Amino acid sequence: MSLALQTQGFSKNQCVTGLRAAVGILEKWQANSDQACRLLRISRSTYTRARQRDPAWAVALDADQMQRISFVLNIHATLRLIFDNPQNVYGFVSMANDNEFFNGRSPLEIMAQGDMISLYETFRRIDALRGGQW
């Protein structure tokens, strides 16, 4: 993690906006609440509040949590570049994958282990699918 990300403060509005976007994506990926909480490193109550979309609700998240949100958003953006079909955009993450890294597990299963390395490595492999698109 870069020093700039570690020291950058995020407003509660930025935190809520990012968290709600990530939770919405995770729901479309068919992540259950336990998987989402482990992946984002948030409590069950924070997850529930994010889903309720109460406009008065605010939350402060740390740099690690914001980086996790960033990975979810970037994985989603990459999948939208790779696939035209919404079923693939939202279904890919929950499908079993026989790639050596995934070893028959879904990307969601790997990410839901909860450690940053699993999240990063999953992002890296999905991002590599873009190949020469850039």
Identify the meaning behind each predicted range.
Residues 1-134:
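Non-transmembrane "mature" sequence context
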